[in-house]
Every structure is written in structure tokens, then in C-alpha cells.
């Protein structure tokens, strides 16, 4: 619960991951189009790459395989197709790593392994924190994905804008699809080799356009 809290001081509230640009372009303009956009990102960008990658990182940290964890961390960083997306995961990963260091999570050796990530990405540090706390993989993965969902809905409420009740309706709909998304992510991570798919051209183009958008509330 701590790791999925919106009060976690890692700056998630300042990012929309392309949603603000989709609003500017008219792709997202009301509750229905917002729900369609977030669902699309959930079942493609999140379920096919970021969530299974989180599972692989978690298993590597839990097994004490720092080399594998560092390798998957680099893979994720390389998969971020725009400068904003790279800067987002770097900043949030760095902030979470600093929090883990300040609060003394895990062992000194594990904290040193996290500090050695260059750069530290958010899924790598989040998965490590869950492994440090000996959380079940399913609980940690669920917290990670639901935190992403909440952030997307919060960004939509500010950016479209939408009312609080619309936000809660969307969360209710999106939450209902989470079990299937998490199951897909686990299956992809468990395949040999892992089935990771980062093909999302519209997402990348919208994110790139946001970098030069004239008026912005969010950093991505």
C-alpha cells in the first residue's frame, strides 16, 4: 500500500505519459475517449512490456541476480522512445531509490546494487523495493499497475477536465480489467524467451509532440 500511495514523494503527479498531448490533439476530449485512451495504454504499453518487465526485475532482485536486474533496467530505459519518457522514469526511479536509502529499506548490499543502476528506472527500483519487503509478486505488480492507473485518471481529471465522479467511474471500469492484464503480464514474463512487445507508434508520436507543446501542465 505504501508503494502505491499517491503521497509517495517520487513526483508521479507531474507526469501524464502523453495523455496531455492526446488532449491537445483532440484524441481525448470526454469521459468515453479518456477511458478508451487509458484502456488502450493499459493493454498494450503496460501489459505487453512494462508490467512483464517489472516481473522479470522482481524475480532477478529476489534471486539476488544483480546482473540480470541491471540488464533488464537497461532494456527498459532503452525502450523509452522519447526524451520525456526517459527523463520521467529516471527522475521517479532516482527519487524512489533515494527514499529507500533514507528509510533504510532492505540490506546495505541491495541498496548499493540499486545505487549502481545507471540510470535507475522506476520499475527497477519499485520491483527491488517489493523484493526487499518480501512482498508476493502479485501484490507488488498489482500495486505498480494500479498506481499507474490512478495517475492516468488524475491527469485526465485535471487536463480534459473531468469531474471527480467521472474519475471514479473510470477507475471502477479499469480496475475490473486488471486481473486479465496482470495475468497476461505474468505469462509474458514466464515465457522463454520473455514475450516483451513495445510496439506503440501512436503513443511514441504523441509523447514526442508533447515535448514541444506550447502550454503544458505536465512534464510528459
Swiss-Prot record:
It comes from the Bacteria. GO terms for cellular component: cytoplasm. Its main location: cytoplasm. GO terms for molecular function: nickel cation binding. Keywords: Chaperone, Cytoplasm, Nickel insertion. It is found in: Cytoplasm. Required for maturation of urease via the functional incorporation of the urease nickel metallocenter. Belongs to the UreF family. PANTHER family: UREASE ACCESSORY PROTEIN F (PTHR33620:SF1). UreD, UreF and UreG form a complex that acts as a GTP-hydrolysis-dependent molecular chaperone, activating the urease apoprotein by helping to assemble the nickel containing metallocenter of UreC. The UreE protein probably delivers the nickel. This is Urease accessory protein UreF. It comes from Bordetella bronchiseptica (strain ATCC BAA-588 / NCTC 13252 / RB50).
